[in-house]
């Protein structure tokens, strides 16, 4: 006997871009695919970067979890045009980053050049730095927003991003922090003591949602920095039930936009924090 469809909408084409540097992309990819798998309307293609312009332009939604993956002008503008035509872009964690690692023998400072201006403009933000990974309090700026409704403020051990921000962002969650970011060329943004971690912006008929929490790192992910085996994996951020609840809602939004009620992906949607 077949299983009745959970999604009343038709087929939704999703392109998942997951790859880059210094993170456990296998872990992140699996977690995101499991969330997408709750939707029987989804057909998903997998990519490591933004170079397959045709596939991304054909997708109803693009979900990206990358670090130091730098879309060129053609790639960024094609993605922008898709969003403007009603597409959805979910940018997770370090997707907003272009990072130049320290040169061997030089001062150990990471620099974050403005290397992908068209893509940064689409996202509405550009990574500059983050403080050391430590427990941080995450607060709701718009507690009534569907992506966070019913989820309380929480503490998580994660990277809090200090970023250059556009003026048209709707900030949904942020984190208070006014200290330095050791190891980065840009250590602070003068006058800013709160840093958005979940926010959105319109682009034509479509939308972009950015959720910058969600660091993860495997044993062998910083070998290029002289540490062949860290001996441990770091998925602490993903162990937060509040983080998982927000991520689940973000993925649901990517699949069905604001009309997520057309899909009934399982009991866990209403029991996120249990």
Protein language model features and the residues they cover:
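Extended, composition-driven regions rather than compact fold-specific motifs
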Residues: 17-20, 64, 162, 199-203, ...
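A glycine-rich, often tryptophan-bearing local segment used as a flexible ligand/cofactor-contacting loop or short
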Residues: 70-150
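Stable alpha-helical elements in mature extracytoplasmic
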Residues: 28, 75, 115, 243-247
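Extracellular ligand-binding/catalytic regions of CAZymes and related secreted enzymes
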Residues: 2-11, 38, 189-195, 203-274
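Catalytic beta-strand/loop cores that center a nucleophilic Ser/Cys/Thr
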Residues: 4, 37, 43, 57-58, ...
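Helical hinge/lid and interdomain linker segments adjacent to catalytic or ligand-binding clefts
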Residues: 8, 13-101
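Short aromatic-enriched loop/helix-cap "lid" or pocket-rim segments at secondary-structure transitions
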Residues: 27-29, 94, 101-105, 184-185, ...
């Amino acid at each position: 006997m077949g299983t009745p469809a959970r999604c009343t909408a038709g087929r939704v084409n999703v392109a998942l871009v997951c790859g880059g540097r210094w993170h456990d992309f296998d872990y992140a990819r699996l977690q995101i695919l499991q969330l997408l798998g709750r939707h029987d309307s989804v057909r998903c293609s997998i990519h490591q970067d933004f170079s397959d312009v045709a596939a991304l332009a054909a997708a109803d939604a693009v979900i990206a979890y990358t670090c130091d993956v730098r879309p060129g002008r053609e790639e960024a503008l094609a993605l922008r045009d898709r969003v403007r035509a009603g597409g959805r872009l979910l940018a997770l964690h370090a997707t907003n980053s272009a990072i130049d690692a320290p040169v061997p023998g030089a001062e150990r400072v990471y620099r974050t050049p403005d290397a992908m201006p068209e893509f940064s403009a689409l996202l509405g933000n550009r990574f500059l730095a983050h403080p050391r990974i430590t427990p941080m309090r995450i607060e709701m700026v718009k507690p009534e927003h569907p992506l966070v409704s019913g989820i309380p403020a929480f503490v998580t051990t994660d990277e809090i991003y200090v970023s250059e921000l556009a003026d048209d962002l709707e900030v949904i969650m942020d984190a208070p922090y006014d200290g330095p970011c050791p190891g980065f060329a840009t250590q602070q943004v003068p006058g800013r003591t709160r840093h958005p971690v979940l926010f959105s912006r319109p682009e034509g008929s479509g939308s972009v949602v950015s959720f910058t929490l969600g660091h993860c790192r495997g044993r062998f992910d910083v070998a290029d920095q002289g540490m062949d085996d860290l001996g441990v994996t770091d998925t602490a951020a993903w162990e937060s039930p509040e983080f998982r609840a927000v991520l689940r809602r973000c993925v649901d939004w990517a699949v069905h936009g604001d009309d997520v009620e057309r899909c009934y992906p399982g009991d866990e949607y209403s029991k996120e924090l249990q």
